[in-house]
C-alpha cells in the first residue's frame, strides 16, 4: 500500500493536470450554455477506469506467466510471487494513478469535442475539402483508393473502418509497454507527459479552433 501511495504522490501533478483539464471543460460548458448532459459521457467513460485497471493487471499477469513458460519456469509459482509483490513493485503500483489521470484526460478530450458546436461552430470543412482535392491532384482521396481495389465500395469502406480502429490497440500496446516492460521511470514520465500534452493541445484546443464535422457528416450540416 505504501508503494501505491508513493506512486500517487509521484504522479500528483499528472492527476492535477487531468483535474484542471476537466475544470476548464466544465467552466466552458457553463459559460457557453452547453447542456450538462454532455458530462454524462464523461461519467460513463470514466467509470470504466476500475475495469480497465483490472484488465491491464490481468494482461500483466498473463505476460509474466508467458515469460515464465518461455524460460521453462513454474508459471503458477511465478504469477503467485508477482501478485504478492504487486503493491511493492513500482511499475504495477503506478498503474492506478496513471489510469486515473490518463482516463480523465481522454474523457475530457471527448467532452471538449462535444463542446465545439457551442463554442466555435463548425466552419473548416470547406477548407479541408479543398485541401484534400489540391493534395490529391484534383480528386478526393477515397476516389483514388476505390479505383485501386478490386472490392466493392462497401467492402473497402468496412476494411478502412477496421483499419482505423487499429490505432486504439496500438495506443493500448504503447502504454502497456511503457508502464510494464520498459521499467525506466524517466522514459515513462516523459511519455505520459508528452502524450497528455498532445491529447490536450491536438485533441482539445486544435479540434476546437479547426472545428469541423468531417467529410462523412458534412452533408448533415
Give each language-model segment a name.
Residues 1-221:
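Terminal transmembrane helix and immediately flanking juxtamembrane interfaces
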